[in-house]
Every structure is written in structure tokens, then in C-alpha cells.
């Protein structure tokens, strides 16, 4: 009956593929309109600012509508944002979109940098921005922290920033406790 109705109304050439939520007791006519207008179910995934690549993979792995396995990508290679995802889309495809968004945005921001910048590459800028972001949870403090770190780097000093120690210990996952004295002495890469 559905095929006949779609064919008779000419909607067979206008149907749009996708995932739909059809209300219970929907009429045949309203279902056809839904499919022709393409009012598909939309799913979103948010990668918050400041989250590590390992945490991003955790988010992707919790999304049951996605398929496939992914390795944890390089730190700083994913752009934090809200992404629209589709049922049966691969996790690798979502990671690739996050990486393309990072490349586009980093290129745009790199072009706007100060000529006096202490960082010499977009990758260094991303690393420094990540450290600044982890050093303070307050956006209003970030310019001061960034200036202090830039001055230290300009003078050849160490950053001596807790987030660099935590990252060396956890590889991007939360530490969940204070830093131990022994960890302050240990070399981390």
C-alpha cells in the first residue's frame, strides 16, 4: 500500500534517505510528507574544549549509533565543537571531520598571530594553548597565563606548569589526585 501511494503521488522520485522518527498512528499521507521533506532525526556529539584525544575517543565509543573502532589520535589534533553524526557513520569518519576542522581553524588562527609570538609553528601554538587552558579554568585568566608562559619561553625558562606533569603521567586522562613529590622529579615525555 505504501509503495502504491508513493508511486501514485509522484513522491517516489522525491523521497530522501535518512533516519526518521515516525509518530505512532501517523497517517500514510503524513509519513510520505515526512520522507519527502527529509525531516530526519539529528544526532549530535560534543567534544568540549580542553578534553584530551583519549577523552574524545571515550565520547565516540559511548555513541552506540556509530560503528567501528578507532585508535587515540595525536594529542591536539581534534577541534572541540559540536558535530552532527549519523546512524552507522564510522567513528573514523567523525575523527577525520574533527581533524579537518582543527586544521582549518588552526590555519585561520595562525594567520592572525602576533609577529612577536614565541611559538614558531601552528603545532607549538596548539600545545601552548592546551597548557594554558589546563592551567586555569577561568577564561578571563588565560591571557595573563599565556603572557607569563610566553615570557618564560622567551627567557629560556621552564614552564613549571602542573598540567604538563599531569599529562606526562596520564597521557591526557584526568589524574584524580594531587601530584606526588616523586612525580615532580621524574622525567616525562
Task: Tell me the role of every PLM-derived stretch.
Residues 168-189:
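C-terminal soluble interaction/assembly domains
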Residues 1-170:
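Conserved catalytic or metal-liganding residues and their short signature motifs at active sites
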Amino acid at each position: 500500500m505504501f509503495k502504491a501511494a508513493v508511486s501514485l503521488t509522484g513522491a517516489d522520485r522525491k523521497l530522501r534517505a535518512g533516519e526518521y522518527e515516525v509518530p505512532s498512528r501517523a497517517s500514510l499521507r503524513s509519513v510520505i510528507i515526512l520522507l519527502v521533506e527529509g525531516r530526519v532525526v539529528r544526532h549530535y556529539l560534543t567534544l568540549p574544549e580542553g578534553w584530551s584525544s583519549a577523552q574524545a575517543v571515550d565520547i565516540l565509543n559511548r555513541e552506540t549509533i556509530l560503528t567501528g573502532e578507532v585508535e587515540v589520535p595525536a594529542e591536539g589534533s581534534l577541534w572541540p565543537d559540536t558535530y552532527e553524526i549519523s546512524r552507522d557513520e564510522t567513528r573514523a569518519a567523525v575523527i577525520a571531520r574533527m581533524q579537518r576542522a582543527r586544521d582549518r581553524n588552526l590555519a585561520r588562527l595562525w594567520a592572525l598571530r602576533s609577529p612577536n609570538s614565541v611559538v614558531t609553528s601552528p603545532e607549538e601554538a596548539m600545545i601552548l594553548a592546551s597548557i594554558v587552558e589546563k592551567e586555569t579554568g577561568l577564561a578571563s585568566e588565560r591571557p595573563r597565563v599565556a603572557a607569563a608562559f610566553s615570557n618564560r619561553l622567551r627567557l629560556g625558562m621552564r614552564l613549571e606548569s602542573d598540567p604538563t606533569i599531569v599529562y606526562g603521567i596520564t597521557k591526557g586522562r584526568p589524574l584524580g589526585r594531587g601530584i606526588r613529590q616523586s612525580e615532580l622529579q621524574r622525567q616525562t615525555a
